[in-house]
Amino acid sequence: MQISIITVGKLKEKYLREGIDEYSKRLSAYCKLQVIEVNDEKAPEEMSAAEMEQVKRKEGERILAQIKQDQYVIALAIDGQMWSSEKLSAEMDKLALHGRSQVAFVIGGSLGLADQVLKRADALLSFSKMTFPHQLVRLVLLEQVYRAFRISRGEPYHK
């Protein structure tokens, strides 16, 4: 399976980079992983609703340019479905069974995802009703994808 993580902005925090590097290494035994960082749009501290939509739209265009036509897209969105780790594993198994070997997970910037990205998504996933920094979500996502592969193969993993 080929997994792409398409995310807005560059990761600067060393502690997050170390965690992401660790899970990327672990995942290499299960899939081909690609992390694609698209540039975030520069935005002032105080923005109108129209300016916020414009920022999301520009970031969305950059995201959509990275999505391949045949990829199954799972967008992380606050109003997405909340899945257990077992459900994520089952969904990934189902995709593989149906020949959908290319999966893209999309993480928006600090303002979230543009409507055009949400419309392109095949599924919307939420980790919580809480809001997390999008950089931290990268690490959590990689850990959950790793956990999903371990569950799928019946390998031990902390519950």
Swiss-Prot record:
Judged by the first EC level, this protein's enzyme class is transferase
User: EC number(s) in its UniProt entry?
Assistant: 2.1.1.177
Catalysis: reaction(s): pseudouridine(1915) in 23S rRNA + S-adenosyl-L-methionine = N(3)-methylpseudouridine(1915) in 23S rRNA + S-adenosyl-L-homocysteine + H(+)
Record's GO cellular component terms:
cytoplasm
Where is this chain primarily localised?
Answer: cytoplasm
Q: What quaternary structure, including any partners, is listed in this protein's UniProt entry?
A: Homodimer.
- Designated name of the protein: Ribosomal RNA large subunit methyltransferase H
